[in-house]
Amino acid sequence: DLPYGCGKTKHKWDREIELTELWKEYKRLLKPDGIVCLFGNEPFTSKLIQSNTYMFRYKMVWEKESPTGFLNSNYKPLSLFEDIVVFSKGTVGSKSKLPIRYYPQGLIQKEQVKRNRPNSTWRSGKGYGGNNKLNSDTEYVTHYANYPTDILKFSRDRNAVHPTQKPVALLEYLIKTYTKEGEVVMDNCMGSGSAGIACKNTGRQFIGIEADDYYFQTAKERIEKA
């Protein structure tokens, strides 16, 4: 959870990190199929995406249970969401040589497998480019229902100890979506350590980095007590 650095707070830690240098370190540490998940709000979200369009894959939205921004409610709509930007060297698609890591949560296995064929629009390629490879002989099998969407609804944790603290349940969801038990998760701006608690709860190893001494000690204590 990087500092957004949008000049909207007076916290000394809320200064935008130099993204070019950050990506050098991420690329050095990241495994070939590793995932980078970063939270953001505009205009910071756009800066994140533009900082590495080669590895940008998609964006999700964290929808909160209640809005924020009441102090400026006379001037703009209340805010109900934050962005989650996903980067990877892996790519999306069944024919990818390096498929992106993705372990969708909450799937329900179907008792009866559903088999589909592309409709006439897909078969003709109209509107999808002339090189569309789908054809009438291709069959697509659906084994599961309840596939996740890009809208993630999670309530904020009560008694938060950091101004931008993310819900442990949301972080657990992301960790389980992109990693397996025993693997390593790093949070280089860990704040109060919620990602560390989420890793402990889900059986992952954790590396946490925090520049602020107070929050580092707070995170250490929270993780040890979890």
Task: Locate predicted features.
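Active-site residues of response regulator receiver
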Residues: 1
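Conserved Class I SAM-dependent methyltransferase catalytic core
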Residues: 5, 12-69, 82, 86-87
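Class I S-adenosyl-L-methionine
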Residues: 8-9, 50-226
